[in-house]
């Protein structure tokens, strides 16, 4: 999610990545019911609302308290906001008795530009602030708290698994040694330590890039959240309902791609297995079909460099 909204009033300017394409992929119906699972600062939600008819409905979700405050600026009666993780979207839909009636779901994954650009949130190695990184600061351990209690092996596993950091063990050892003598509480402290401990310099990338990504993903359980959200979307979509997902790195995109592929194939039956037609029917068939993917063009990347790694994938629920 890279959403460069400047203010939270109704007239603000924004640069949501693949904005038009992601919403167009939902195939908006005038009276449809839609979910924006990652409200952010509302770029996608506002565009969806502009295309809905008077009987349409949009349910937005976000776990970031600042996003909830931004959503309060929207007074449209067709719009409602839920404060919570998008991984619980099926739960929210069940409470509303709308399972099987959702015409489209949009998920814009990862961290948003307002979160990155606010030093007090602790997401960025480019700005000094509290070493926090939580999407919802009221829940769970901050990055500083986790790094203080985690072992070098645990930290190395996180850096390797979620950041694909080649020097994970070396950096983890340096983090633990530093915290034993002078606990880190600021993003600049962690970024400087990683820069000094890393034996390799990439002139195009800060040495702390992968480590900050990895710690953020772990602290917020981002990949597990994505898996649960996709399963929930599959449960609640109406026949011919659309799923539109924007990812920003290979770990996210791999989950989305594999999810769509899995539900597009139907049951995999070993050759020669003796099954009756009734048994085959009971196993069900494919429940999704892929309707393509997109990446930002050169013009969008030039305007918004953070869009460079984004991938937009679409799927459609097959009617039953």
From Swiss-Prot:
Cystine bridges: none
Family designation: Belongs to the methyltransferase superfamily. RsmH family.
GO cellular component: cytoplasm
Cross-referenced PANTHER family: 12S RRNA N4-METHYLCYTIDINE METHYLTRANSFERASE (PTHR11265:SF0), S-ADENOSYL-METHYLTRANSFERASE MRAW (PTHR11265)
Pfam families in alphabetical order: Methyltransf_5 (PF01795)
Residues that, per the record, bind S-adenosyl-L-methionine: 42-44, 62, 86, 108, 115
Annotated HAMAP family: 16SrRNA_methyltr_H
GO biological process: rRNA base methylation
Superkingdom per UniProt: Bacteria
Alphabetized UniProt keyword annotations: Cytoplasm, Methyltransferase, rRNA processing, S-adenosyl-L-methionine, Transferase
Protein name, entry field: Ribosomal RNA small subunit methyltransferase H
Enzyme Commission number: 2.1.1.199
Catalytic activity: cytidine(1402) in 16S rRNA + S-adenosyl-L-methionine = N(4)-methylcytidine(1402) in 16S rRNA + S-adenosyl-L-homocysteine + H(+)
The keyword Nucleotide-binding appears for this protein: no
A molecular function GO annotation: rRNA (cytosine-N4-)-methyltransferase activity
Purpose: Specifically methylates the N4 position of cytidine in position 1402 (C1402) of 16S rRNA.
Signal peptide start-end: none
Ubl conjugation among keywords: no
Localisation: Cytoplasm
Main location: cytoplasm
């Amino acid at each position: 999610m890279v959403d460069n909204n400047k203010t939270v009033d109704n007239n603000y300017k924004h640069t949501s990545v693949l904005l038009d394409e992601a919403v167009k992929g939902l195939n908006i119906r005038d009276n449809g019911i839609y979910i924006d699972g990652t409200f952010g600062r509302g770029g996608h939600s506002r565009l969806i609302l502009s295309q809905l008819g008077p009987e349409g409905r949009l349910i937005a979700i976000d776990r970031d308290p600042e996003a909830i405050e931004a959503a309060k600026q929207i007074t449209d009666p067709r719009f409602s906001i839920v404060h919570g993780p998008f991984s619980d979207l099926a739960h929210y839909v069940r409470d509303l008795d709308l399972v099987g009636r959702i015409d489209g779901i949009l998920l814009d994954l990862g961290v948003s530009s307002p979160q990155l650009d606010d030093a007090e949130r602790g997401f960025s190695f480019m700005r000094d602030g509290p070493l926090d990184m939580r999407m919802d600061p009221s829940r769970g351990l901050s990055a500083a708290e986790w790094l203080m209690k985690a072992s070098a092996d645990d930290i190395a596993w996180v850096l390797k698994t979620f950041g694909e950091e080649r020097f994970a063990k070396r950096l983890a050892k340096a983090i633990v040694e530093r915290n034993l003598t002078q606990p880190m509480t600021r993003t600049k402290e962690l970024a400087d330590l990683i820069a000094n401990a890393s034996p390799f310099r990439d002139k195009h990338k800060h040495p702390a890039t992968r480590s900050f990504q990895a710690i953020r993903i772990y602290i917020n359980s981002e990949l597990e959240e994505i898996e649960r959200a996709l399963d929930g979307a599959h449960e609640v979509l109406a026949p011919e309902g659309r799923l539109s997902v924007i990812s920003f790195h290979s770990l996210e995109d791999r989950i989305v791609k594999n999810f769509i592929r899995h539900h597009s194939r139907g049951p995999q039956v070993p050759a020669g297995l003796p099954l009756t037609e009734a048994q085959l029917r009971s196993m069900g068939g494919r429940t999704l079909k892929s309707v393509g993917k997109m990446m930002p063009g050169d013009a969008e990347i030039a305007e918004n460099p953070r869009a460079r790694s984004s991938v937009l994938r679409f799927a459609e629920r097959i009617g039953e």
